Each structure stands twice: as C-alpha cells, then as structure tokens.
C-alpha cells in the first residue's frame, strides 16, 4: 500500500531552475529560474499580461521546445521528450493552443481525429466512434464536416480542445482559453474545465490535472485552486486565491478589473 501511495503522490510536472526562451526568438529569455511542482489533480492558472511569455512557457511545459537552462520532469521522465522511445509518456499530456490552431484543409472531424490516426494508427472508420462523443460533448456536431474557416473563433477553440482530449490525457495545458470569447462561450469553457477537473464522463470520471494561462484573473477566482504569475521574466507561485487576495500588490491590479480587485480585497 505504501508503494501505491507513493505513486499517487508523485508530481506530474516538476521544474528546477528552469529558464524559458521564446519559441519564435530562441535568443530571447521570457522567464528565469522557475521552480514549480504540479501534483495530480491540481488546477493551476498561470496569469500574466500580454507579451510576458505565457504561451512560450506553456509550449516548453508541453515539451515542444527545450528549456534554455534547468531541469524539467513529466511523470518522472526528464523533458523534453523528442525521442520516439519515450513518446508514450509525452502523450499523457494534452496541449490546447490559443485559437485552436486547426488545419484549414481538413474538416473539423478530420482535425479531431488526427491524434488517433497518427499516434494510434487508426483508420478513418476506426476513429469515428472515438471522436463522435467529443463532437457531441463540445457541441461541434453541426459543423463536423465543415472546415475550421467556416466557423467562428469561439468554436475553433473547441476544435483544439477536442483534438487534445481524444487521447484521454492525464494533464491538459490550455493556452488563453477565454481570450476573445463572448460571455456565453467563456462560461461554457469555465464549466467544461470544471467538469474535466472533477472527472468527465468521457474520461471515465478520472480527474484531469489542468494548467491554464490567462491575462485576467477575475473569471478564475472561484474555479482554479492554485495560481502563479509571469511578470518581468519571473515565475512566482502565489498559492490559493485567498493567498493571492491577501498579498495584493500592483500586479493584482494589472490582472483584475478595478471593480473585481476592490471586491476581492481581504477584510481588515
């Protein structure tokens, strides 16, 4: 039993002294000396203003590029995983790009099926029953045979989410999910991420560990359980929302609308 308990408490992500470079400009550093641990079942929001390197941080966390310095482990395996032999570990993590980043020459159905076709070598007919439940759950069914260019940004983001979920990841990284969304779609995302965190039916009720980036903390106050900030090339772990609100500071004013910041000040 002790051995099983140790496995359950092993971090899913761990960084020591990590420096992150820019994906588009490798010579530029966006964050330095990151020390961070993510446990199974965590729900993190990493906040920062536009241009602070949130997307680069998430791309590095998702093993799409190596850290400039430092060490990083995913499920105990050193990152990044570029070799084919350790790809299985990498596929336990899903990544949702800002905007969805679908292929416009493929239909929505074909975009979502890509991980199954490529990583599991499934044929079109074999993949279909595995993607249809996600089309339904994400309300994409009416546009399944359309191309991404035929639908709005609100829906394109969901295509990227469905594509990341078809392989049933244990960890999901989501870049700026609420950016550019109207209130209805933003509310849907918040509720759906809550369902993933609790354990979605399509994932056999297994909770997913979440790391989300955001430029506005307000929508996440009652949702996420852990918060961190990227500011001036520094990654700072803030803790729970109660700890964030108690700390206050200039950075909080930057990442909250004025009325939300006033409302969430701790009572003195």
For the regions a protein language model found, what residue spans apply to each?
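Helix-to-loop junction immediately C-terminal to a conserved catalytic motif
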Residues: 62
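ABC ATPase NBD coupling module
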Residues: 79-94, 244-247
């Amino acid at each position: 039993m002790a051995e099983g308990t140790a496995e359950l408490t092993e971090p899913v992500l761990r960084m020591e002294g990590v420096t992150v470079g820019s994906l588009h400009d490798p010579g530029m550093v966006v964050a330095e000396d990151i020390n961070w641990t993510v446990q199974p079942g965590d729900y993190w929001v990493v906040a920062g203003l536009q241009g602070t390197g949130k997307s680069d941080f998430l791309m590095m966390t998702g093993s799409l590029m190596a850290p400039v310095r430092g060490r990083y482990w995913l499920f105990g395996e050193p990152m990044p995983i570029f070799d084919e032999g350790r790809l299985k570990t990498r596929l336990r993590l899903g990544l949702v790009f800002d905007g969805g980043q679908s292929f416009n020459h493929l239909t929505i159905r074909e975009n979502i099926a890509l991980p199954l076709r490529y990583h599991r070598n499934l044929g079109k007919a074999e993949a279909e029953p595995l993607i249809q439940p996600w089309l339904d759950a994400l309300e994409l069914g009416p546009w399944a045979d359309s191309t991404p260019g035929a639908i709005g940004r609100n829906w394109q983001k969901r295509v990227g989410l469905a594509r990341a979920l078809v392989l049933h990841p244990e960890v999901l990284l989501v870049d700026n999910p609420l950016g550019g969304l109207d209130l209805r779609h933003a509310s849907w995302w918040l509720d759906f991420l809550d369902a993933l965190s609790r354990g979605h039916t399509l994932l056999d009720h297994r909770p997913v560990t979440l790391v989300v980036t955001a430029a506005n903390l307000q929508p996440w106050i009652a949702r996420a359980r852990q918060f961190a900030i990227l500011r001036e090339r520094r990654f700072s772990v803030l803790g729970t929302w109660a700890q964030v609100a108690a700390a206050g500071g200039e950075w909080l004013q930057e990442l909250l609308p004025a009325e939300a910041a006033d409302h969430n000040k701790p009572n003195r």
